[in-house]
């Protein structure tokens, strides 16, 4: 409530000025005040921040730059495949190398390199990748719809756009290319666009980036021959490497904190608000789990956020341990949300058994409930063997626990499955999937989980 005139407000015989009325309306809310204790610049710990220097990736950067040297010499580019799990520096390395190449080509008269970068996370086919690449090259008013064209026409349009560039080279960066699954046609046609005569005047190179270690192995032989001229593996960071990354960022993120780089490349930290165990503990937690710098930074940021909320003067080991629990919950939610529908239906079957207090359960009981759920939403019903494989995958991802039961010669041995994470987290994520919404709508009391 905001007053703009000079009238008074009388309540129970008491005359209140406008200022008092305004204070009464917002009573209980704290004033917004700049953080002068914990964070100096919290953005450096959050997703989207771009550091000036990428540490602990010297070898990978050198290999990447070496692979692109033919371009600056006017030769055809190599096709590259970068792989490693999330948060190990693949995308950031690629952008740094591409920007350096773009900067250095400005000094050359006979080399003109065009760059196109596309994140394929939300794309699930070569057709969609090709259509989106066409729109990357076109002006907004000339862009096409992502569906409705014959496959051959889409590739013809893409090759025409490459011909129009009037450049000596075009490097196409396809990030998270594993999203297209087995439909890898684009990864054959684009790297071979010159050899097959589809593009004549511009040398085309493809840089594929994947978070999935198995994606490269599952590529067809012809794609491997075309795409993988050179492969660069980005391994997980170890605890020491993560510690250096955290120290570098902490010096910018927190008040009273400085870092200096020693001759051996390691960082030394001095801080008034970070207890000595904070950085090593964040690094150790992330290294043990995934080796992801993104996870380590998220953990340090969460610990700082908790300290700020508590109006603490420093960040402690206790903040880190509680932050680790919170980040772990968030990570499971994100990973659950990315699962394909068939995996979610499998988990739904376990939710039904959980509601019946029937976990752990054998595979055949889980499969029975999976079939009911799949039919309910008109999804394809997979075989028992396929669901067995999905149960194994869900176990490897940490969502399920499996135990072997041996009932002797008569009963035989079999496996039983149950949740390794809280069932309510699984339920919340599945309920938020529009495809599965009908399973939670309360239409059929035997199927729905409204009273879960």
Residue ranges and their predicted role:
Residues 1-78:
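A short, basic N-terminal segment
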Residues 29-35, 122-131, 136-189, 193-229, ...:
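Mid-core helix/loop region of P-loop NTP-binding domains shared across ATPases and GTPases
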Residues 76-99:
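Walker A/P-loop nucleotide-binding motif
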Residues 81, 104-122:
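Conserved catalytic segments around the Walker B and adjacent sensor/switch elements
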Residues 98, 187, 388-392:
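Short, hydrophobic-biased segments on the C-terminal half of alpha helices
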Residues 306-327:
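Conserved C-terminal helix/linker of AAA+ ATPases
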Residues 326-349, 353-360:
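Short alpha-helical segments that sit at the start of domains
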Residues 360-452:
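Terminal-proximal interaction/regulatory segments of ATP-powered molecular machines
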């Amino acid at each position: 409530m905001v007053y703009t005139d000079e009238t008074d407000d009388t309540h129970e015989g008491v005359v209140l000025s406008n200022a008092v009325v305004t204070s009464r309306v917002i009573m209980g809310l704290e004033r917004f005040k700049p953080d002068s204790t914990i964070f100096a610049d919290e953005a450096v710990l959050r997703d989207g921040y771009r550091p000036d220097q990428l540490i602990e990736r010297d070898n990978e950067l050198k290999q990447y730059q070496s692979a692109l040297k033919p371009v600056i010499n006017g030769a055809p580019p190599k096709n590259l495949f970068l792989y490693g799990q999330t948060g190990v520096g693949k995308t950031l390395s690629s952008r740094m190398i591409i920007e350096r190449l773009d900067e250095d080509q400005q000094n050359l008269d006979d080399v003109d390199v065009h760059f196109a970068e596309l994140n394929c996370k939300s794309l699930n086919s070569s057709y969609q990748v090709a259509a989106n690449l066409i729109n990357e090259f076109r002006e907004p008013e000339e862009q096409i719809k992502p569906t409705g064209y014959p496959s051959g026409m889409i590739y013809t349009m893409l090759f025409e756009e490459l011909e129009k560039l009037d450049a000596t080279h075009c490097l196409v960066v396809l990030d998270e290319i594993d999203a297209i699954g087995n439909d890898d046609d684009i990864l054959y046609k684009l790297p071979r666009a010159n050899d097959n005569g589809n593009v004549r005047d511009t040398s085309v190179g493809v840089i594929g980036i994947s978070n999935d270690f198995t994606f490269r192995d599952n590529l067809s032989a012809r794609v491997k021959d075309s795409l993988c001229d050179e492969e660069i593996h980005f391994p997980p960071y170890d605890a020491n490497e993560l510690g250096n990354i955290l120290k570098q960022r902490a010096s910018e993120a927190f008040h009273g904190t400085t870092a200096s780089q020693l001759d051996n490349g390691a960082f030394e930290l001095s801080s008034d608000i970070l207890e000595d165990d904070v950085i090593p503990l964040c690094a150790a937690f992330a290294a043990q789990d995934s080796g992801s710098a993104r996870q380590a930074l998220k953990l340090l940021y969460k610990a700082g956020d908790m300290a700020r909320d508590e109006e603490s003067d420093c960040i402690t080991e206790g903040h880190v341990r509680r932050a680790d629990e919170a980040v772990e919950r968030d990570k499971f939610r994100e990973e659950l949300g990315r699962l394909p529908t068939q995996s979610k239906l499998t988990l739904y079957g376990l939710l039904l058994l959980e509601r019946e207090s029937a976990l752990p359960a054998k595979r055949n009981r889980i499969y029975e409930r999976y079939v009911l759920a799949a039919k309910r939403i008109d999804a394809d019903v997979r075989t028992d063997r396929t669901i067995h494989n999905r149960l194994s995958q869900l176990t490897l991802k940490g969502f399920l626990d499996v135990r072997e039961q041996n009932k002797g010669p008569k009963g035989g041995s079999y496996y039983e499955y149950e949740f390794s994470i809280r069932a309510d987290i699984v339920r919340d994520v599945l309920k938020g999937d529009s495809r599965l919404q009908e399973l939670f709508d309360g239409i059929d009391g035997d199927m729905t989980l409204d009273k879960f």
